[in-house]
Amino acid sequence: METKTITIDSKTLAFYQNIVISLGFLIPFLISGPQLLTGTLVNCLLIAGTKFVDKKNHSLLAILPSIAAVLNGLVFGKFTIFLVYFLPFIWISNFVFIKSIIYLKEKFPLTLSVTLSVFLKSFILFLTALIYFKFSLVPEIFLTAMGVFQIVTGIMGGIIFFGINKIYDRR
């Protein structure tokens, strides 16, 4: 595997970091659905965060999108208490997603690292949804939302990231 080193000055990196983190909040706050769109864009940003966001801000990037989604529901009237139940697990799965990509890309191609990380994130969320469902805390629809949809939006987010990354690396 050929490795290419790209140098980014600190001012440019700070600019990109601010864009990624801001969009991580704004997209789920301003776009209330469908999950396929918002989830894909958020996953793309989480992946972009592995390249453009300082390590110390990964937790911020992992947390902001779900807070924005809750606020969107409160402000625009589509609030569901069920999302609140998932918040800590969404934060954990997003953080694990970011960190596993960073760890795995040292050992595998980025495409495989992202794919494996998507499945890990989806597993965490599906397992949480399954436990909540078994205890009758959430309706069955959350098994799909936190399972298959996570895989689909993660893969689609990865595809978009790879396209953007290819353009970025050519500049």
Model-derived features: where do they sit?
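Residue-level signature of the transmembrane alpha-helical core
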Residues: 18, 22-25, 44, 63, ...
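Aromatic-anchored segments of alpha-helical transmembrane domains
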Residues: 22-30, 65-76, 119-127
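Membrane-embedded alpha-helical hairpins and interfacial helices in multi-pass inner-membrane proteins
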Residues: 33, 76-86, 93, 99, ...
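Hydrophobic transmembrane alpha-helices
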Residues: 2-52, 56-57
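Hydrophobic alpha-helical transmembrane segments
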Residues: 29-38, 59-67, 91-105
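Hydrophobic, membrane-facing alpha-helical anchors
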Residues: 34-49, 64-74, 145-146
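Membrane-embedded alpha-helical segments of multi-pass membrane proteins
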Residues: 37-49, 88-96, 123
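Residue-level recognition of membrane-helix boundary sites in multi-pass small-molecule transporters
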Residues: 56-60, 112
